Design a protein with these regions (language model features):
Chain A
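NTP/phosphate- and nucleic-acid-binding module
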Residues: 1-539
């Protein structure tokens, strides 16, 4: 059994996640996150916020899953969010055309056209996996879930393909709440939907998934990005080194300065992402960033990098995408709605002085030259004000100071978007936490992911010990711990069960507990035990 | 302007929530939760868990929004989750038939039939709000959002009308994870969808909403519910007092013992709910529980109580429902799938002794009576074993102990379900927090709802003060605070803005801060200020 299969089995038996609707024979592309998975998911979300949201004073929103068709028409999804679908002429089975081809060893890329795929399938006589026939028709399949809003048949809606559009359509209100200022970061954690033609690969190609997205709105002429790291190195498989196939190790600062990354915010987010995924337990060497070239990128993106994690069984697998969306989305919605979606920047121009002549006085003083004085522009010299080369006395002019003048600049902000697949991160986290010790499975999840989870175990099933254990359980639950209570079986077996489930600490209540109140605490990874007071856990 | 309108205006301008898609002209029944609303929502969720999930060791899961049609056919939703829809014969406008009638002053209840509504609308010549015509056709409208899963046209799906079904279909796996034990509580916080015919009432009738549900599975013959409160009083408008229209004040214990509540868990959850909604800031006197009578209840429920909160503008409004679903759902899914969805309870029968005679020895010892001894049943008396009235010596018999015998009992567990509408709770929380002080608006949200939010304000816009303020901001953000940074405008105006937004504390950085590091901290509700060190906030 390969590691991934072992991990998926463990994920089900220990309550992390499993394919939904199994009693109904299963429906591809849907997973249920179980009790342990829910705890981990919340902690991954919180860790993500500590990297991407909180340090920059960004905001978080929660917008609907259902979107009116007009919004997604304007955003370009109705026209572009499609996959090539091959239909077997004989049995009518439907597949992803590009997957059929690559499974048959025929190279395709994200820029291969529908017609090309049609030809390739038919000319190479690729067999239908269902009936063996070799005649195919390829067309585009819109992979958004369609529905109808309300009772009128013409009111079409879609389930959002990304949370981002729920942010773009609320840009105006959000900018008001942020008091007109950019850079403004708006995060959203929620579900995305993609009506895959024939999903495979368990947690990787889901029809319904969890996303964490951040739309960073900024002034393209003055990005105001945080300082970039000049020392750390990111493995970037960017356009210029793509042919070699090996990532270049380069600092975020260098990659931005050299023009490899088109935005300083993009560089900043790649840096953050690398550290974030490391904190989940994925080693540096199992991460890389790969640039998506023209034709591979989404329709809205001027530059895209995918953050990939390596799995032995699946190779490099995307866990996050970073798109430089520019002003594409705001402009599209502005055009469709006729609304102005802009930042209004008011600049104060520095103090300006103007000299105004007192014409009456000039006429009285300069009987001869007054006309040439009045018709020329006064000039300020070190020793006074001159006009037509003649020095004026102070009663002949007034200096008017315009102290403030506002200059208004309107612009459509540019957007950089980090977008994370939460289910894939969950899988990667468990995959890299999974290991063996003395032939037993251990799920060594990082503390930041499962810190506040603890098991409480009465050593033997005696009434007073169970009561004491319940007392400790209640105390820990009051302090926000998630407590697993397990009173059955040999203690060694219970420890083994907990190690495999990833529970970081186990507290055992024994005879001595009844005497002096102390318990043993056992560590999942080292198997070390020591006696403590239960309240020591709370500090 | 009434209070509700004021609250809704504030909710938008301060970033709590607002109607979605406004730049597209709006789509009824959809709301976006803004930055402040997201913070509050998370805290309401966490508070709910501290009442309903953590204290009992319950589990939480996260299942898909999209469900295959077969699941919701089995659950009874496809046949029952419908509203009466009246269509105008002239202009084709569609409305909730019962709303049209009650708006015209004609009494209907949840048990009035389609045919009755049809007659009532036409006979009373109720006018179409759109064109004024008076001819109607009433039919049932299925209010689930329908979609198609994958590329095959016959693979229908629905957006879940409740999170509960995602729990019921995973019951088998969840019971395994819980090691076969009931009571087992499974919570889910997520979205629900209801394709309303013509939603009105802002946050009350949403087409997409946030729910918090708990399915409590238990043995109906031995509920094992926690101890019920005998002292607190709940206002129950139950069946027996419904006609009087006034709730009876009765303890959860009393209501269960008197048969007003059919399950002890139901009584326990009502008690919890009352305390929970009080913690959100809704006074006792603005809460009640009302029983839903036959015909008003959902198809799956043997007893339902709604938890209602009073709004001046809308009257009593449901924020939660408590349904005694019995074994309805598990039986329905078991029937449809042929799977056994049961709890298997293994009982150990108490130790049993049997006495076996050593016939050879008996024959040797009792030459005369051995036949009558062997043919009778041995009897255990205080002083030894007798057979046919004769005391036997210890070599004449053996006592065989059957130490353990397992008795297996299978049963379909019963379910009690608390189900909360999170959006309505959010509205109620803000509504009851909203008030005035010296003519100014204050949103006095309870600390538990917005505790870790703070504003940091440099007194004047000077470089060193702003830098110091940023330092304090970073420190607070590191400790998990959500920090609002506001450097513009007179300090009094800034305080007023923060009071209205509900921000509990404001920290002001002034000249003295630059000298000794102290700041002033100002309280939203009392307007009191005192000097502290910023690190004092963290303890």
């Amino acid at each position: 059994m390969d590691k991934l299969t072992e991990v998926l089995n463990l994920a089900k038996s220990k309550g992390y996640f499993w394919p939904s609707y199994e009693i109904y024979g299963g429906v591809s592309g849907f997973y249920t996150i179980g009790p342990m998975g829910s705890l981990v998911l919340k902690n991954i979300e919180d860790l993500w916020k500590s990297y991407f949201v909180r340090p920059n004073g960004f905001l978080e929103i929660d917008s609907p899953d259902i979107m009116p068709a007009r919004v997604l028409k304007a955003s370009g999804h109705v026209d572009n969010f499609k996959d090539p679908m091959a239909e077997c002429a004989k049995c009518g089975s439907k597949y992803r055309a590009d997957h059929l081809l690559s499974d048959s060893g025929i190279q395709v890329s994200e820029s291969t056209s529908i017609n090309q795929m049609n030809e390739l399938l038919n000319q190479n006589k690729v067999k239908c996996p269902n009936c063996g026939a070799t005649t195919w028709t390829v067309k585009q399949f819109l992979n958004m879930f369609e529905t109808n809003i309300g009772p009128y048949a013409d009111n079409k809606g879609y389930l959002r393909p990304e949370t981002a559009q729920g942010i773009f359509v609320e840009f105006k209100t959000l900018l008001d709440i942020n008091r007109g200022k950019v850079p403004m970061g708006i995060a959203q954690i929620g579900r995305g939907y993609r009506n895959e033609i024939s999903p495979r690969q368990s947690m990787i190609r889901l029809r319904e998934f969890h996303m964490m997205e951040l739309e960073l709105f900024m002034d393209p002429e003055d990005e105001k990005a945080p300082a970039l790291d000049r020392d750390m190195k990111l493995p970037l498989l960017h356009e210029k080194v793509m042919e070699k196939g090996e990532p270049e190790l380069i600092s975020p600062y260098g990659a931005y300065k050299n023009g490899i990354l088109k935005s300083a915010w993009l560089a900043y987010f790649l840096e953050k992402s690398f550290k974030f995924v490391m904190a989940l337990g994925v080693p540096e060497s199992k991460q890389r960033f790969i640039e998506k070239l023209v034709g591979e990128r989404a329709h809205y993106s001027a530059q895209t990098f995918d953050h990939e994690v390596f799995f032995d069984e699946m190779g490099w697998t995307e866990v996050a995408g970073f798109a430089y969306r520019t002003d594409y989305d705001l402009k599209s919605h502005a055009k469709e709605t006729g609304q102005e979606l802009v930042v209004i920047e008011k600049k104060t121009i520095s103090t300006r002085k103007t000299i105004k002549l007192n014409e009456k006085e000039v006429k009285n003083t300069h009987k001869k030259d007054w006309e040439s004085i009045i018709s020329s522009v006064p000039e300020s010299r070190e020793d006074g004000i001159y006009c037509a080369g003649i020095k004026l006395s102070s009663n002949e002019y007034k200096i008017i100071e315009e102290v403030e003048k506002e200059e208004v600049r309107k612009f459509v902000p540019y957007v950089v978007e980090p977008s994370f697949g939460l289910d894939r991160l969950l899988l990667a986290t468990i995959y890299y936490a999974y290991g063996k010790k003395d032939g037993r499975n251990i799920l060594s999840l990082p503390d930041v992911i499962l810190g506040k989870v603890v098991a409480v175990l009465p050593l033997v099933s005696k009434k007073d010990m169970i009561e004491k254990a319940f007392e400790i359980k209640a105390m820990l639950e009051k302090s926000g711990y998630f407590v697993i209570f397990d009173e059955k079986g040999y203690i060694g077996k219970r420890y083994a069960r907990l190690d495999e489930a990833g529970i970081p600490k186990a507290i055992t209540v024994d005879g001595q507990t009844l005497e002096d109140g102390t318990v043993t605490i056992r560590d999942r990874d080292t198997w070390n035990q020591k006696r403590i007071r239960p309240s020591d856990l709370l500090v």
